[in-house]
Design a protein with these regions (language model features):
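Unchanged
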Residues: 103-194
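Nudix hydrolase/Nudix homology domain
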Residues: 2-4, 15-28, 96, 167-208
Length: 208
């Protein structure tokens, strides 16, 4: 199942996995009409203020991938959930509970970007990747351009003493350990994409 998040609404392609959307596939004649229709639909969906979940079925991954590339500028990112003693590291970015993440630089792998961004945003070093988590996809308007951000997520551990230092120039004001007593407030306050996609993983991490 492939989901795109925008503010408080979700677009769902239940029969498609995100890895099927890679460019380079051959476009069939039947896909051409779907691509045009999907581009129109995506534009209307972005303008719609109704906070609902919308399902799109019986469309080929090729058509979906091409429509997304025509509608959005792709902006890959990576981040991580740092685990320590049954808790995880959360941040407050511009007043919103969040997880450390950032853009993938040219020539950088998602894994390297996750390690770099988490250390930059939290001040926590000696990070190691334990496993990959599901990616999140969300879109936003930057200037006059719609961007679609895929964020690669990883569970991270560290041998470093947890002496966090928030990256204030990125709007981060707090870096905290989140445990059982704080997780409900974190998930309620964070972005819909994190709550829906990573929420179950977070609850496993802190053993709820």
């Amino acid at each position: 199942m492939y989901k795109i998040f925008h503010e408080n609404k979700t677009l769902v392609f239940p029969n498609i996995e995100s890895e099927e959307l890679k460019s380079g596939a051959t476009i069939q004649e039947s896909d051409t009409y779907d691509i045009e229709d999907l581009c129109i639909f995506l534009s209307e969906w972005l303008d719609d203020t109704d906070p609902t979940q919308t399902l799109i079925q019986q469309v080929s991954p090729v058509a979906v991938g091409e429509a997304l590339r025509k509608t959005f500028r792709l902006a890959p990112a990576a981040g991580g959930i740092v685990v320590s003693g049954g808790k995880f590291v959360g941040i407050t970015r511009k007043g919103i509970p969040d997880l450390p993440k950032g853009h993938i630089e040219a020539g950088e792998t998602p894994e390297a970007a996750a390690l770099r961004e988490v250390e930059e945003e939290t001040g926590i070093g000696k990070l190691k990747i334990e496993r990959e988590l599901p990616s999140t996809w969300h879109c936003y308007l930057r200037g006059e351009t719609w961007e679609l951000k895929r964020t690669y997520w990883y569970v991270l551990t560290t041998d470093d003493p947890l002496l966090p230092h928030p990256q204030q120039e990125e709007g981060i004001t707090e870096v905290n350990l989140v445990g059982k007593d704080e997780v409900e407030a974190f998930l309620e306050g964070t972005f819909l994409s994190i709550r829906e996609v990573l929420g179950p993983e977070i609850l496993k991490i802190i053993k709820i």
